[in-house]
Amino acid sequence: RQGKDSIDNLVDIIDKENVNSILVFTDKGVRAVGLCNKVEEICKTVQYRIIDDLTAEPAVADVERVINEVGSIKYDLIIGVGGGSVMDASKLASIILGADYSLRDLLKDSSIAKKQIKTVMIPTTCGTGSEATCNAIVAIPEQESKQGIVNNCMIPDYVILDVNMIAKLPPKIIAATGVDALAHVVECFTSKKATMLSDTYAKEGACKIFHNIRKAYNNANDLEAKAEMMLGAFYGGVAITGSGTTAVHALSYPLGGKYHIAHGVSNAILFAHVMEFNKDGCKDRLAMLCDAVYPELAVKSIDEKADYIIKEIADIVKDTNIPTSLEEFGVKPDDLDFLVQAGSQQTRLLVNNCKELSLDDIRYIYKKVM
């Protein structure tokens, strides 16, 4: 369900699913600005509970704490209202509550997961795409990194894309989450696992994000651009489910896990550099993406089109004032050995990359953003 005031469709979902009890996941920031008010109002027709103390990019212990708090109480529906962290936690709860396995079991083998409770995702950013994906990310503090749990049963049952939820989103959040969404579509399109279906969604998402991210960032009142960004992010999530992200996301995980750099920002710092490294392995695909996004572009050669996309990525990061260096976050050259080792362990994503990355390659990319 998509469009202004589409949040009202939540009433129909509750009726259709014969819901008597609801568990709502959100965070204090979302509640503080009133984005959960309408959801709470609608939920008052049944029994409901709100969990609003989720941390950004939650660790295993954070998710376990929430699961333990809920205990054996049965709920008919889980609603996630927030950004990627909130939606990921909601999706994890939907497969763990009432199950005979734990989160740590899933970290070892996510294939055992089964959907226990239906879900509704209501994103309040325009970037993560978690509302459409079959995966959830948790931080592993002892490894100073992150891990994804992947199973198709985590694909949300319902999604509500209401532009009112991002109408007052700060520009810096639009920028970071928007570039994250852009990374999703570009990585999925250049992934080894790309399919015709993922290509369709990646190209459509790319068109929406490339053409609207600056508008949404620069003009707080441009709800049309923001709505297009939400839809582009959703398409990126669908593309991930059919294809998968690659080295940008793989190398960003240690940056979030150890230095707590926001996910979208860490992706943005790496994005153009990884694509430049990848170029000779995917320039045909980048050229195809360029044709889809900029059909009137005067450049003709495959190399020029690939270069144009990579430059546009770098320009968007610059134009939306996202940091471009890890130095701003206290990352030092002495940290390179850790980053190289931690990044190389993200094999779930690195196997999707169009080029194999050696330890020296990973070191080269990290050094570029120091």
Please describe what each predicted stretch is:
Residues 135-243, 354:
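Carboxylate- and glycine-rich phosphate/diphosphate-binding segment that chelates Mg2+/Mn2+
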Residues 258-335:
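Gly/Pro-rich interdomain helix-loop hinge
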